[in-house]
């Protein structure tokens, strides 16, 4: 049995290093000696539980980098097993020469069941998009060959939903923040927590999921959405604390893309502004690193989609057309918080539940 003292030390070490998760092994980091000592202590703990192997060392460095905390030898073994399975998935997938690559990230020691329960929403029927109301532009209005709304300066920074299935709120605020900045030329950060706490009457369920189309309707009839500063994110369901004097944006209406109509979605993303979309996340996607994601195993129906995000552009990479999408799992996930999804096949239902707001 491994002495409890070592695991207590590991918890303390990890707590101290959580604030420097992105600088763990950078040569330019001025506090590298502290990080190195923390890594050394955790490595000793992991080796005591797992033995001195290359994979155990890799696991210890992963834990330090992402500020992990393991409270017992049993948990170290459990997380190491999941981490090893993730590592094998990354290696086997990347050997296939697909259009995308996986990589180890902060989710590598979480089981699929844990990840699904804390990062994804429950499937909901996107009935609003059965018949869309987006008006396609005239044929004389040419779509740009590629589009990236970040280059126009209207896309807000990537946020992190944490351990709450509130992706729909971040998709909603991302679309609203872009629309507001496009209209005013000023940046804004809006309250996801208000949507978590206050949107239940419009068939949204806080940390258990919701839909941007329903969130836009809530904001429209509520009279607005507060700013992030006045109503900060907590990542748990709470009591509604909306205050009219703190409203940052109002919604006049929302526009829905017809279910599965990628031509409408491309028209909206190319010529209007970023669009809230949803798709089905399946197990390997959580380890996405780069490239154009594609899958033969995800669904495309309204009851398949389980994660809401924001389409901010499109393009072509190595001959594969893609959607450029902003996620809400932090800027250290994927390609600086973004990913690319294959276009033209309604991949994983990306055009199944899409809508965008019209702001006051």
Swiss-Prot record:
Broad EC category: hydrolase
Signal peptide per UniProt: 1-19
Catalytic machinery residues: 167, 307, 327
Propeptide: 20-142
CDD domains documented for this protein: Peptidase_C1A
Glycan attachment positions: 125, 256
GO cellular component, one term: lysosome
UniProt record, GO biological process: immune response; positive regulation of apoptotic signaling pathway; proteolysis involved in protein catabolic process
Single GO MF annotation: cysteine-type endopeptidase activity
Highest rank taxon of the organism: Eukaryota
InterPro entries (UniProt xref): Papain-like_cys_pep_sf, Pept_asp_AS, Pept_cys_AS, Pept_his_AS, Peptidase_C1A, Peptidase_C1A_C, Peptidase_C1A_papain-like, Prot_inhib_I29
Disulfide bond sites: 164-207, 198-240, 298-348
Tissue-specificity statement: Expressed at the onset of germination.
Annotated localization: Vacuole
Keyword field: Disulfide bond, Glycoprotein, Hydrolase, Protease, Signal, Thiol protease, Vacuole, Zymogen
Function: Involved in the degradation of the storage protein zein. May play a role in proteolysis during emergencies.
Protein name in UniProt: Cysteine proteinase 2
Source organism: Zea mays
Gene designation per UniProt: CCP2
